[in-house]
């Protein structure tokens, strides 16, 4: 979906289709809906090499991978917009408890900006790391924020009861 959105943006040019699983395979062979739209091959996701070539790197990786790759050299050259949860949570202990993995870049958590533009637009513009919000949180925050901002609800009593199909949060169907 990210590729489709970027391809339709007048100011975006995709330079690199990174993948660890599909290196040297045509992107459209992996993602058939891109047949006759994308003629590029997937390349290894060497972020240090890529940082010299682009203004922004989008990562759409499993939890933990972006945090294990990001470093000061990369961030000195480009911005990162991370679609995983690696920089969404400001408490490393909560992240590690929830995802059952050690956070590999806790030094960047405080500077990462939660990328909900409706609330953090100015911070997103200047951030080196943008933590792309997930679907549940976006829905929940955009629903409650205007009411909370005006003091119309008590946040300590707020309950969000949300449901998902089998593909929610990147999960597949399994028993």
Task: Label every model-predicted segment.
Residues 1-175:
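N-terminal Rossmann-like NAD(P) cofactor-binding subdomain of oxidoreductases
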